[in-house]
A protein has these predicted regions:
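Sequence-structural signature of the catalytic-core scaffold of metal-dependent phosphohydrolases
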Residues: 1-136, 145
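C-terminal subdomains that position terminal phosphate/3'-OH groups for nucleotidyl transfer/ligation
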Residues: 113-192
Length: 192
């Protein structure tokens, strides 16, 4: 009762939006990443055809498609949340000091942005360091989200034509991209 045959019964758009690597397992190569097994190629081809995904493979080659546009947004959300949440978690676990965490998170903002964040914490009477980190983390996530949306809009034609390369996070404006990269490097050095 209450169950449907076929599992989740996701829409084609939902399925396509979570396939980060829209190509057959035969294209996996050294990195071992692919979106579907060769045995599922006809099912994915049906989805791709219905959604108008751009086929990048020549006839007779294993299937390879351009990403569905929503994949870029899903990937950005994943990149942002994992990286920034790991910083917050590292502070809670005392892997990173409060000063390291604070400097890293505030480093996503210019002087005015930093002053606004610190003023808000002061105005609200937030003295608990964990709560301060939570607020700064939320500000960073919001800034990165906004930057990725802008990048998506600015590169919409390339994304829709299947010519956009890389992730949205790698194309955001330099100050945020550099701050994000500092977080990645610190995580590799001290967290993982």
């Amino acid at each position: 009762v209450g169950r449907r045959a076929g599992g989740y019964v996701m829409t084609y758009s939902t399925l396509a939006s979570i396939v980060k690597y829209p190509f057959s397992s035969q294209h996996a190569g050294a990195h071992g990443k692919f979106g579907f097994f060769e045995s599922e190629a006809s099912s994915f081809q049906r989805i791709a055809d219905e959604l108008g995904l751009i086929c990048l493979s020549a006839p007779g080659e294993p299937l390879r498609y351009a990403r569905h546009p929503l994949v870029y947004l899903m990937e950005a959300a994943d990149d942002i949340c994992y990286e920034i949440m790991d910083i917050e978690d590292s502070h809670k676990l005392k892997i990173l000091s409060f000063e390291e965490t604070r400097n890293l998170l505030l480093g996503f903002f210019d002087d005015e942005g930093q002053a606004n964040i610190l003023r808000r914490l002061d105005d609200e009477g937030v003295t608990d360091r964990n709560e301060q980190v939570v607020y700064m983390r939320a500000c960073v996530v919001g800034a990165l989200e906004h930057a990725c949306v802008n990048t998506f809009v600015n590169h919409e034609d390339e994304i829709l034509q299947g010519t956009f390369t890389g992730s949205l996070i790698k194309h955001i404006d330099t100050p945020l991209r550099e701050a994000y990269q500092r977080g990645v490097e610190l995580s590799r050095a001290k967290v993982y």
